[in-house]
């Protein structure tokens, strides 16, 4: 707990934050300054609950992922863009997959996301 208080680098909870209750406990203990939200780690409804608890507690937010393909990464990008308030974005794991049949409309080289052309839905199409 002392690390987060003494560090100028924001300490971010990753695997230790799987539920809204975890986020609340981490905030109450002042254990971290940020929470890494991952849809595949917690699921959509729990991720939304974690988001709201973290915002209410004044914690910074990060959107990330496990080793997921373009569908999951694109959905996470849309979630983060729609909710707002994210200080850190780590949605590049789709770039690590050498071959898949999908084209993510927002993911570009160098892990840059551009959702400006997005329409209804997640925007994934077959190549």
Model-based region annotation:
Residues 1-74, 98-107:
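Catalytic core of soluble alpha/beta enzymes
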Residues 66-127:
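Flexible C-terminal active-site loop/helix
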